[in-house]
Amino acid sequence: MLNTLESLFKLARDRKSNPIDGSYTNKLLSDKSLSKEKVLEEINELIEAVDKNSNKIHEAADVFYHLIMFLEANDVKIEEVMQELNKRKK
């Protein structure tokens, strides 16, 4: 399961270094404003899906994908996020 998330982080880093023309991923990585808008949009869609008990998995996946791209676009390193989460374990 976590391998899928790790693959997305690797994809984001790779595409940031080696862009592919026409790639949606690259569009998100190069346009911080769009990336931010998409994270907000997808979170709202997830909340709605949970409230309606419909399409929750699809919307949750969208949130993960767009959040990963947003973090990478803004040079937030996942390793640092993971370190912070580890500090919070009790």
Residue ranges and their predicted role:
Residues M1-A60, F64-K90:
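Flexible "arm" and connector segments at domain edges
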